[in-house]
């Protein structure tokens, strides 16, 4: 059988995009494959070369699939970044403006834009799009879609190009338990008609229908093996692992704690967009020193609730909300609120696109800016570097942030939330895109940080096993559909 993709001793033409050694890669129709490795292992580099985005030297490639990139039936790549504002940093706060709702397209409009110009869409393609389930939401504007619904919309749009190979980066990121199950079922259904390549950094994210795993480590393709061989090897490696050194001890805290026992008070808070209630008559109090897990399905309003606390949502001025002992809308600036908060979220990752050294991205957390507008002192830079080393990101400090892998960028933004040692730590899915090792390390740092009695935590996660052991309260939201 002629393979769809055949690469022998592949080397990227541009030195910046090369793996450390030439690689071999073969893909046959229906041979659904996972590219697996830790953050920074080289998964994205390999994926770009497989997809033809990075030309190879010589005659390493013997198939013609990459040349079909701009035609029907080639390789298509799907990465689930936020699609609300095209990754524009200015849109980070504008997303929450109710008046902006009119600028968002509907699902039907987004699907129509994805159709090939001047060509009739085949019945087979329409069937595939129908299988995504997104056609049940044609009249919704995309800002009202849950993460799982957005995932289905982006997948459906890609199907109009009738790919032979669909490559998906971190397919389950940001999805709740039910959405993960549902999206896995969708991928399995799609696998009957096209060939899938999934890029993952966690073993738990390898779907049951995947039969082949390609592993990378330190920018080198190390193993190509069956699913069974992969899990057996990983089990054997776990038995011989050398314990990692403990993270650096935490520095003494110097950031002030706002006066008053209650950090946050919501009294009968309701938030609506159009005719839909996002939050409905919510009463909630967070006291100093409490550690909260904020849970609920995609679309339940968790990110909206956090936007009210972080002073990003203008509806906060009209709601009966007290932050750090003061009623919102009584003349305080958003910076007076933000100075007490360390924050990271998927939306921040999507919109923080600054070409700066990673240490400057981390240091921007000292002054709550998206970008670095005040040069940190040498002492501040050294302090930020200590925090990067604490999270295992010290070797990223001088690298251009935009040259890092998605997982490495997310790690730098997590460091950014800690550098000013805030009184209130708000972590919205902080382990998005992090491998198991970095997740465990970060969780232990959170526990150590929250051992201080005057620090408060609110953390969102769709994985209960990710929650740190310090969690002592839980607020569960439900969708108001």
Region locations from a protein language model:
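The feature captures the beta-strand-to-loop junction immediately N-terminal to the Walker
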Residues: 36-38, 295-297
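ABC ATPase nucleotide-binding domain signature region
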Residues: 47-116, 306-370
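Conserved ABC ATPase "signature" region
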Residues: 120-137, 363, 378-396
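Walker B catalytic motif
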Residues: 141, 170-171, 176, 400, ...
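Conserved ABC ATPase signature
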Residues: 141-145, 149, 373-376, 400-404, ...
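Hydrophobic anchor residue at the start of the ABC signature
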Residues: 154-155, 414
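Conserved beta-strand-loop-alpha-helix hinge in the C-terminal portion
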Residues: 208, 216-244, 468-469, 473-481
């Amino acid at each position: 059988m002629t393979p769809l993709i055949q690469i022998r001793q592949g080397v990227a033409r541009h030195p910046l995009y090369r793996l450390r050694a030439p690689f071999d890669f073969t893909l046959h129709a229906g041979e659904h494959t996972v590219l697996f490795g830790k953050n920074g292992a080289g998964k994205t580099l390999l994926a770009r070369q497989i997809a033809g985005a990075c030309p190879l030297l010589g005659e390493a490639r013997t198939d013609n699939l990459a040349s079909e990139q701009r035609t029907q039936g080639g390789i298509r790549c799907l990465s689930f970044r936020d699609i609300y504002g095209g990754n524009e940093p200015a849109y980070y706060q504008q997303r929450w403006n109710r008046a902006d709702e009119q600028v968002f397209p509907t699902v039907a409009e987004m699907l129509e834009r994805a159709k090939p110009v001047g060509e009739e869409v085949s019945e087979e393609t329409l069937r595939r799009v129908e299988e995504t389930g997104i056609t049940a939401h044609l009249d919704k504007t995309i800002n009202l879609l849950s993460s799982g619904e957005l995932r289905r919309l982006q997948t459906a749009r890609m199907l109009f190009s009738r790919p032979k190979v669909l490559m998906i980066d971190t397919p389950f990121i940001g999805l709740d338990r039910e959405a993960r199950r549902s999206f896995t079922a969708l991928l399995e259904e799609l696998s009957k008609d096209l060939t899938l390549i999934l890029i993952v950094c966690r073993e738990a994210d390898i779907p049951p229908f995947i039969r082949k795993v390609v592993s990378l480590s330190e920018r080198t393709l190390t193993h190509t093996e069956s699913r069974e061989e992969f899990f057996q090897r990983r089990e054997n490696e776990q038995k011989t692992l050398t314990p990692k050194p403990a993270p650096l001890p935490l520095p003494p805290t110097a950031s002030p704690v706002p006066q008053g026992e209650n950090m946050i008070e919501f009294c009968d808070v309701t938030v609506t967009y159009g005719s839909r209630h996002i939050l409905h008559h919510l009463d909630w109090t967070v006291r100093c020193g409490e550690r909260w897990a904020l849970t609920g399905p995609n679309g339940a309003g968790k990110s909206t609730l956090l936007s009210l606390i972080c002073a990003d949502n203008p509806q906060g001025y009209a709601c009966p909300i007290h932050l750090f002992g003061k009623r919102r809308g009584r003349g305080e600036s958003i910076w007076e609120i933000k100075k007490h908060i360390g924050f990271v979220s998927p939306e921040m990752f999507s919109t923080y696109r600054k070409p700066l050294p990673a240490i400057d991205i981390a240091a921007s957390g000292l002054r709550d800016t998206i970008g670095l507008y005040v040069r940190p002192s040498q002492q501040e830079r050294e302090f930020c570097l200590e925090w990067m080393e604490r999270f295992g990101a010290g070797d990223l400090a001088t690298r251009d942030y935009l040259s890092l892998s998605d997982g490495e960028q997310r790690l730098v933004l997590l460091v950014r939330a800690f550098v000013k040692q805030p009184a209130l730590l708000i972590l919205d899915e902080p382990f998005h895109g992090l491998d198991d090792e970095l997740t465990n390390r970060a969780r232990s740092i959170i526990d150590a940080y929250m051992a201080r009695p005057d620090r408060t935590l609110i953390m969102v996660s769709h994985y209960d096993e990710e929650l740190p052991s310090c969690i002592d309260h839980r607020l569960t939201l439900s969708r108001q559909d």
